[in-house]
């Protein structure tokens, strides 16, 4: 796991976009793992700007990390619609190549299996973007999730529903269930970039980067990933014991190495 401490959301977005641009130039049909929430927004902004100056997404594909269960088609908070609004409608990726779990399916387990099969048929995810919750969750893999888990239905804990209520008219409108890629699914991605900003994420960052690998902190499984990059601002890095080491390592790595 590489930890990179940067000065704010803009340099974080630029560095993550650098990795995605390099991937697309090397592999134009790359498979991107797309997250929602505030963490990836600077990346999407930067990629949209680069597309405007020529970065090509026409052969790429994308897979959303998760989706609410039970929201009607067209609901603005369906994650498939959020991803379109915030990113894919701003680039030239083919709409048919952007996939998300079917939260409106009548047979949810079958929809989960179909999503796993679609990821596998695409050749797997080349680069997965992630955020992290204050309790260490990634995707909607809440504390206690199995490290071997695959795409499945999950119940949202009340704190997560409260955190997401700002996107809905009221807490009562926030769904109780989601479909999420599992921790095992996420770990299959060839490169994972996790973004965390703000002091409210500092304890979670310390727990999953420097704490024990434990189900109480789902993101800690990334310690076992062969190519995980953690991009944090100074506030999110404020609880890290080894912050100076991470700064020294990044400042002195060869320029050709990338992230």
From Swiss-Prot:
Q: Write down the InterPro entries for this protein, in alphabetical order.
A: Glc/Gal-6P_isomerase, Glucosamine6P_isomerase, Glucosamine6P_isomerase_CS, NagB/RpiA_transferase-like
Q: Which GO biological process entries does UniProt record here?
A: carbohydrate metabolic process; glucosamine catabolic process; N-acetylglucosamine catabolic process; N-acetylneuraminate catabolic process
EC numbers: 3.5.99.6
SUPFAM superfamilies linked to this entry: NagB/RpiA/CoA transferase-like
Q: Which Gene Ontology molecular-function terms are recorded? A: glucosamine-6-phosphate deaminase activity; identical protein binding
Active site located where? 66 (proton acceptor), 135 (for ring-opening step), 137 (proton acceptor), 142 (for ring-opening step)
Q: What is the name of the protein in this document?
A: Glucosamine-6-phosphate deaminase
- The organism is Pseudarthrobacter chlorophenolicus (strain ATCC 700700 / DSM 12829 / CIP 107037 / JCM 12360 / KCTC 9906 / NCIMB 13794 / A6)
Lineage at the top is: Bacteria, Bacillati, Actinomycetota, Actinomycetes, Micrococcales
